[in-house]
């Protein structure tokens, strides 16, 4: 296993409440913001977090391996200033067969995403997906250290799956819209229609009821 060169984040970003400007990435799926000069490289044998093999202040898809001749780590920044995303993309990584994952840093929100993107039907990743602050503080996705892929083999984003990490204290009541599931093209003569969608609960309290408003073509909210 090896580390990449030190890379610069192309916008202001805070990790665990503190500003960070640079990172490096291991060929075993670990991105670290600290001790950039000479940290030991984590091996491909992943484990539950926290783990002493992982440097402080790290994000990881630990357990994938950049051992193939066409296994690469690519970076690209998307969006406009103020709301950009910086993607660190593990392409064609080895996990039984080819496997694609990304770590994403988001400007403005300081959110971190781990994106499960695309896999061969023969791939069998068993990864630790999460964040380690130090030797005693870490969080990992349920299922780690044997977290399997959810995304299929499509090169399109339609079957991608992601895990979102938000800094701060969890609100008791919080929700976000995921999708509008009503068919986008409707014949008015067939009205009335049922407006449907999906929401996700981001709060600690169970949601038992809510008010939902919507507008059509910029009209008054209903």
Task: State where each predicted segment sits.
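Extracellular/luminal regions of secreted and cell-surface proteins that mediate adhesion/ECM remodeling
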Residues: 169-222
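Extracytoplasmic Ser/Thr/Pro-rich, glycosylation-prone low-complexity segments
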Residues: 1-173
């Amino acid at each position: 296993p090896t580390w990449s060169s030190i890379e610069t984040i192309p916008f202001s970003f805070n990790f665990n409440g503190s500003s960070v400007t640079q990172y490096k990435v291991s060929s075993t799926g670990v991105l670290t913001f600290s001790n950039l000069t000479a940290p030991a490289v984590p091996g491909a044998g992943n484990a539950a977090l926290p783990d002493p093999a992982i440097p402080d202040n790290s994000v990881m898809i630990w357990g994938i391996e950049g051992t193939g001749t066409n296994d690469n780590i690519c970076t690209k920044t998307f969006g406009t200033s103020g709301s950009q995303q910086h993607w660190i993309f593990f392409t064609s990584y080895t996990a039984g067969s080819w496997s694609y994952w990304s770590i994403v840093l988001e400007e403005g929100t300081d959110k971190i995403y781990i994106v499960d993107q695309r896999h061969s039907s023969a791939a069998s990743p068993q990864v630790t997906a999460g964040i380690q602050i130090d030797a005693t503080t870490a969080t990992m996705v349920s299922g780690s250290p044997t977290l399997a892929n959810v995304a299929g083999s499509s090169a399109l984003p339609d079957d991608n799956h992601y895990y979102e990490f938000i800094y701060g204290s969890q609100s008791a009541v919080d929700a976000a819209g995921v999708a509008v599931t009503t068919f986008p093209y409707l014949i008015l003569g067939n009205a009335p229609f049922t407006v449907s969608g999906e929401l996700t609960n981001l709060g600690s309290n169970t949601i038992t009821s809510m008010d939902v408003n919507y507008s059509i073509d910029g009209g008054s909210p209903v």
